[in-house]
């Protein structure tokens, strides 16, 4: 029984510091990532529908999404700079319990200002997992457990689990329609039940994190955990990633659903199906990204897979029918996320191990702050026009980001690419 539990990553008595302990940590993180991704997968799609059901307008939806990202950014910044003082397990369990409290709050509160406060303090994610206080902690742990040659593949698996499970979770966005039809309850009550389920997933994640061992792979970092050696490059990357994130904030899943809902009268069930296939394509692209990165390098993979996806994004609003818009959306999804594992691997590769938590936080937080402006602007644009101006602007900014990233990082290579 112990052997089976160790294989599955469920054995708490793995030898500290050994290979089995490292595998245990990674498996626990993958399991927890999957639980959170499943919840984020449907909540990111149902959030705008729920807020519209409560009587809020597109601008209100944008404001709440913006405040959610701002809150995530502040929390991630605090955690990133102080993570080296605590065991990661403690911080991850606390974050999971906060996730549970967030779901409970959205399930029982319907007034705008209290919801806004919960959005700022909590973990609700309008980007289906793209911005989260969990990520810097998990990235730092994974980068310590993996060798340089395996690091990109490890982050690809991490991203694969998140994206694949989020895609399956997106299918659950059709559950409120089913609950209304089968149970005869109102749409508001059905949506509130989905937020209760989100809270339950938060508790499940807390139990999974609690199983992490308090050993060298998750213990305190040295006191010099802030940026020193890599400060200049990390801040350059943070600025570039912020430009990309600002564009991404205009087209978060919640805002895309809002545009499709307004433009084509999209149902929640169909939205879930669309984003399931989009997530599925993105999931398998992570594995392909590893192969491409081994051939052409991390930076080239980030740039030359991202460019065509941004062009597809610009073209979506010009499509005359929902079918054509969905086709381009899926084509974009097949390419747009290849930079996720490669970007994370690149940042973790070019900084010293003791600076990784701070680097992960500093490159994540500006992304969160920058993307937070996007929903507010997108909501304002969509409140005056059903044309997809947010998509056009987002695609243009992302193309600019790709070109600037290529110019800035072309000579800074990770260890595995240095001959």
Model-derived features: positions:
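Helix-loop boundary and gating motifs at the non-cytosolic
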Residues: 19-70, 233-241, 245-276
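Conserved MFS/SLC helix-loop-helix module at the cytosolic interface between two early adjacent transmembrane helices
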Residues: 74-112
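Helix-to-loop junctions at the C-terminal end of transmembrane segments
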Residues: 75-87, 177, 285-298, 382
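Structural signature of the two symmetry-related core transmembrane helices
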Residues: 90-105, 300-315, 395
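C-terminal membrane-cytosol helix-exit motif in multi-pass small-molecule transporters
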Residues: 173, 177, 199-218, 401-409
């Amino acid at each position: 029984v112990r052997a089976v539990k160790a294989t599955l990553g469920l054995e708490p008595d793995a030898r500290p510091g050994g290979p089995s302990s490292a595998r245990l940590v990674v498996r626990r993180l993958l399991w927890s990532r999957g639980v959170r991704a499943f919840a984020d997968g449907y909540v990111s799609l149902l959030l705008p529908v729920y807020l519209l059901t409560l009587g809020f307008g597109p601008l209100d939806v944008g404001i709440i999404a913006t405040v959610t990202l701002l809150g995530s950014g502040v929390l991630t910044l605090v955690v990133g700079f102080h993570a080296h003082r605590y065991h990661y397990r403690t911080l991850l369990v606390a974050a999971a319990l906060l996730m549970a409290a967030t779901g409970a709050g959205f399930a029982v509160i319907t007034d705008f200002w209290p919801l806004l406060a919960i959005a700022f303090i909590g973990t609700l994610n309008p980007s289906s997992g793209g911005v989260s206080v969990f990520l810097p902690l998990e990235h730092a742990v994974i980068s310590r457990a993996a060798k340089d040659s395996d690091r990109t593949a490890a982050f690809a698996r991490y991203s694969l689990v998140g994206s694949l499970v989020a895609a399956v979770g997106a299918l659950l966005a059709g559950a409120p329609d089913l609950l209304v039809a089968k149970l005869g309850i109102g749409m508001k009550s059905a949506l509130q039940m989905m937020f209760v389920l989100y809270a339950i997933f938060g508790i499940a994640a807390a139990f999974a994190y609690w199983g992490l061992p308090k050993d060298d792979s998750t213990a305190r970092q040295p006191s010099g955990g802030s940026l020193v050696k890599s400060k200049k490059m990390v801040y350059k990357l943070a600025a570039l990633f912020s430009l990309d994130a600002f564009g991404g904030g205009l087209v978060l899943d919640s805002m895309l659903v809002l545009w499709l809902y307004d433009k084509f009268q999209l149902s929640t069930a169909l939205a879930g199906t669309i984003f399931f296939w989009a997530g599925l394509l993105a999931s398998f692209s992570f594995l392909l990204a590893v192969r491409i990165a081994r051939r052409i390098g991390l930076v080239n993979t980030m740039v030359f897979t991202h460019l065509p996806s941004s062009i597809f994004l610009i073209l979506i609003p010009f499509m005359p029918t929902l079918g054509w818009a969905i086709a381009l959306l899926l084509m974009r999804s097949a390419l747009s996320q290849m930079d996720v594992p490669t970007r994370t691997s690149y940042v973790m590769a070019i900084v010293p191990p003791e600076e990784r938590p701070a680097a992960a936080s500093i490159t994540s937080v500006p992304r969160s702050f920058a993307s937070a402006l996007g929903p507010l602007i997108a909501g304002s644009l969509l409140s005056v026009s059903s044309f997809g101006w947010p998509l056009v602007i987002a695609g243009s900014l992302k193309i600019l980001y790709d070109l600037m990233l290529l110019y800035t990082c072309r000579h800074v290579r990770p260890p595995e690419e240095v001959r």
